[in-house]
Structure formats: structure tokens, C-alpha cells
Amino acid sequence: MCTAATYQTKDFYFGRTLDYEFSYGDEIVVTPRKFPLDFCHMGKCDAHYGMIGMAHVADGYPLYYDAVNEKGVGMAGLNFVGNAVYQKVEEGRENVAQYELIPWVLGQCANLQEVRKLLAKMNLVGTPFGDFPAAQLHWIIADASGAITLECTKDGLQVYDNPAGVLTNNPPFPMQMFQLNNYAGLSPKQPEHRFSGQIPFTSYSRGMGAMGLPGDLSSESRFARVAFVKCNSVSGDSEKESVSQFFHILGSVDQQRGCCEVAEGKYEITIYTSCCNASKGIYYYTTYDNHQISAVDMHRTDLDSKTLSCDKPGMEEQLFCQN
């Protein structure tokens, strides 16, 4: 269970929450331009765009959850269990395994238009990485011009325009967008009294214009809530204001330990939240036990290196004592 969002002020921001009951040992990973990407069916790529994101590095290969490349294109994979159906390897097609899709796209595409052209030629297959099972995912891909959602189901590969600029999990994206119709009457303003002129109404609280906005942790509810918060969000253009506001947006769907039990004594939590300034290549993050916003700047690493640059996220809470 995860949530991803885009945000535009002076710069373009892209990020997500990763909600799960355990971590694989994630790291902030910079894949430099000359790091050899060995694709399962497409051979080796020795030169590509640099990228930064959160990944689990297995056998020297970055398995990205989310990433942004040096051109400002962002991409995140989110659970899509029960609906993701990958295709079979076909001779003569550009067969790309689901685990390598993020570096495949971000390594080649400088903008969303190029992404669309690349996806039109691609055959997305379910080849697993080593002993890992093939993760059932769908993806949000975005730049400053807009966002798309990529889903591979029993009906084949689908690319959807994503005007909301958000994504969660099930149900499929068209259903998520359709259910937003249920909230067309919501507003950040106080509601007008239209029930009846015969009954006196009192607005007894602020925020009543958004009554009916779902507050539970299901993926459909999180989609509606983060879309409302993101689309009505107001922020200054500075880096501090923009980054702070982005974390507030995704904070609206934070998962607290104890509220989503997945097995006896096991709870889904927001393991990390990311916010990448895609325009500048700066990856900000917080973790469940460390709310201090930390940053890794892609351009402070050697982007012409052949070696991954990995930083372990800070996991211990930082408390500032004022006296």
C-alpha cells in the first residue's frame, strides 16, 4: 500500500510513501550515467541518463521503488496485486522485465513525450529477479508537463493520462478516477446551505466543505484524499516552502503503526516518504522513526562514474532541544 504524488511550484516535485510491514533495507541510490545496466532481455546499456531514488540493491543491481532522472522525469512503482498481469516474452519485441522498468525508462527518456514513444514499443514481461517473486505493480510517470499511469492487466498494456497527478493501489486507475465523481461537491471553502430554505443551518465548524472526504487507509480512499489535498494545496515558491508543503500533502495519507494490521502483531506503516525536486535532482526523504527531512543531491556525486552511490537513510528520530 503506497501513495505517489506530483507537485508544481517554481520547480517540479515528485515523490511517494512506501507503506509496508517490513523493509528490505532500502537506500538512496544514485545510478550514474556510465553504470552498466544489464537488462534481462535487452542486453547491456553502458551509457544513459543518471538517476536518483530509493532502491534495494541486490547483487549490485538497483531495484528502484521510485526515482527521478537528471532530465526531470520521475517514476514510481506501486502495488497492484491481483490486477497486474505481465506479458510473455516475444521475439522481435523490446521485452522489459517489471523489476528493470524504472531504469529502462529513466535511462532513456528526457520528457514525458519520449516516455510515451518508448512505452508504445515495449513488451512488459514478468521475468523475476533472482529468487525474488515478480512484484505486481503499476506505475506513475511524470515531468513538469504532466503525468501518466502505466498498467499491464489481462487486457494488455495501458497508458492513461493522469490529470490528478496521484496514484495509490487497487482498483485499476480508470476506476480510481471515476470514483472522484463522488466528491465533486467537496470544497476547501465553507459550504452553502442548499438543503432547504425551510431549515436554519449552522456551520458549527471550519472545514465542513470537505465533509465526506474519506479518512480510512484503503487505497481507494487514499487516492481521493491525496488528490483533494494536492489539488487544493497552496504553497510559496521557495525550496523550503515547496518541500515542506509536499511532505504535508503526503502526510495526509500517513500510516501509523497499529492502525492497519496485516497479520497477528504485524502492522503496515509508512516506512519512508520521499520528495524529489525533479528540476534540481535533490532527493528529500523522511522515515517512520526519523521525521527530520534529509536530502541527497544527485549532482554532488560523480554522475560520470561507473559505480553506484548509496546512502543509508537515517532511521533514528532527531529531536531539537531549544533550552
Regions found by a protein language model. Give the residues of each.
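Catalytic cofactor-binding cores of redox enzymes
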Residues: 121-158
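Short, surface-exposed beta-strand-loop junctions and turns on beta-sheet-rich folds
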Residues: 20-22, 81-83, 155-158, 165, ...
